[in-house]
């Protein structure tokens, strides 16, 4: 009986232990090389809502409003930003690298019927690898965020890539963003027009390093409201 109790206690403990950090993955990965985006191009704007309360959780989950990617992805994103300038747009970044603990907080706080919009912490997120980016466009002439037909983190069909209910201008901007990102190796997530994954995401491990351990913050322009 004593052995049975021990076995049951261990069985109950395993799931809890499994959620105490990123899942352990087999294989070999490239060494992480997270770069703060605004150090490569300070004209990339930041609107890091997870450092504020105006997000779907209603509370900050980052202590600092910063955005990072693995170096090859960051360099590719700078090329996207500069190419879009020829079309009259720049990039506003909502989120890049995301510590695993934040992914778990998102999952725990999201209703079952909305979990298509958040990553399962048991598998980890491509954001945790520093290879995903959430972003939108802004108008160079006015500095205002572009109207994309659905807001960031809007958990509705309007956020789907296949949504066709917007205006021609909204859909054209989505297509412009997708095309520019695709040419530099970023592929859109079908359920979120703002979310793109870098082609080499499988090469990097899942990370749970908070921003404050990634060096001194760099200054960045603040995004204007649409």
Located regions from the model:
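Short, well-ordered surface patches within globular domains
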Residues: 102
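Conserved metal-phosphate-binding beta-hairpin within the catalytic cores
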Residues: 196
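Segments that shape or occlude catalytic/ligand-binding pockets
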Residues: 99
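Bacterial N-terminal signal peptides
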Residues: 5-15
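Extracytoplasmic cell-surface/polysaccharide-interacting catalytic and binding patches
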Residues: 18-96, 106-191, 200-226
